[in-house]
Amino acid sequence: KLELYDLSAKGYKEVVLVGIDLSSYGKDIGCHLVDAVTMACTTEGIERVRLGSLEPLMLTDKNLSILAGLPNFCPQFHLSLQSGCDATLKRMNRHYDTAFYRELVQRIRSRFDNPSITTDLMVGFPGETQEEFEQSLDFAREIGFAKVHVFAYSIRPGTRAAKMPDQLTRQQKEQRSHQMAQVTEESRKSFLQSQVGMVESVLFETEKLDGMQHGYTKNYTPVCVQSDRELCGSIHSVRITGAKDDYCIGQLLTEQEQAE
């Protein structure tokens, strides 16, 4: 809490809670991650609180209700997935399946205003057949992630997976990485396009460069606006007017527009 007050006093408007296993925060001290989020959201001067990567099982109905009731909480959910195929998830020893994940995404989208869902997807895990890979592709298309980090499985000596049979070749993994990236990039473009026409608060994080200034909405959509004003470190209402490959373009609202 003292660190939050210190950050607020220094003018920071957004904090991001991160950790190697963020979802397990507080288990050793008798509290829960949502307690830390609530504390951060109610710290004077802190206008935004964002979370790092989360395990899907952490987001119970109770926890979602608490988060949805915090105005300063940023509705960007980076939900661990790894694969969109149940057979692969089972070999990975994941404790959720695609049905659970799908239903969780639906609950998030019904409870939060304009949330974004991001994730990591691995291809080429030992034993991944072409059919399993295609199931993962289809699931990624279905969910429509705002952004995905795609990566190929690599052997780590001493792990259970390293000893599994049916290791894929480098060529197979590279090919699947390329295919998955193509699918998720299309989802990314669709998500950015869906933001056009919306009015969002944007925290500007970079100084002027050729008259363009860059920032992020609460759901972590990157937005670029043209302005002669110094916006870095401040939050402004922006109407999103267009979408590029990896960011949106917007216009600052005038005081009159904000009052309407």
What does each model-identified segment do?
Residues 26-41, 45, 92, 155-186:
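Radical SAM enzyme [4Fe-4S]-AdoMet core and its adjacent flexible, acidic
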Residues 54, 91, 148, 225-226:
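Thr-Gly-centered strand-to-loop micro-motif
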Residues 17, 51, 79, 120, ...:
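Conserved, mostly hydrophobic/aromatic
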Residues 1-24, 62, 77, 99-110, ...:
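Proteins enriched for Cys/Gly/acidic motifs involved in redox and nucleic-acid/cofactor modification
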Residues 163-260:
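Terminal RNA-binding accessory module
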Residues 128, 142-145:
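Contiguous mid-protein beta-loop-alpha structural module that forms a pocket-lining wall or clamp
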Residues 9-130:
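Conserved SAM/AdoMet-binding glycine-rich loop
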